[in-house]
């Protein structure tokens, strides 16, 4: 991680932390580096590809459940920058795990394929973002209930 700027280092650190289970950081770090060292089909830097993929998946708005007079409404709201990045990474990893279960291939290949799909604005992580934006636009008439 020598020639990376602060944002890229933070993104890789978040990726490792989200993927880590039972405190096995070195194992997860090796998987992440194998993912990044896979031969890319593009000529771009793989870390830059990951940053752009996360940018394509970041949600702008989300919905929160608010109870008013005994009725629960889905109220749309703006997502903070850190939460945008967190949700994007989480969705990419969830999609990679689902792809791994359905196709029975290595996690490195699944992660790289999902990052490539996110970069090209397709895949299940992008679909999840579009579904969330659709839900927020459907419920935008309840935006006046937002008081947080």
Curated annotation (Swiss-Prot):
GO terms for molecular function: mRNA binding; rRNA binding; structural constituent of ribosome. One of its GO terms (cellular component) is mitochondrial small ribosomal subunit. GO terms for biological process: translation. Its main location: mitochondrion. It is found in: Mitochondrion. It comes from the Eukaryota. A stretch of 270 kb of the mitochondrial genome is duplicated within the centromere of chromosome 2 resulting in the duplication of the gene. The expression of this duplicated gene (At2g07696) is demonstrated. One of the primary rRNA binding proteins, it binds directly to 18S rRNA where it nucleates assembly of the head domain of the small subunit. Belongs to the universal ribosomal protein uS7 family. This is Small ribosomal subunit protein uS7m.
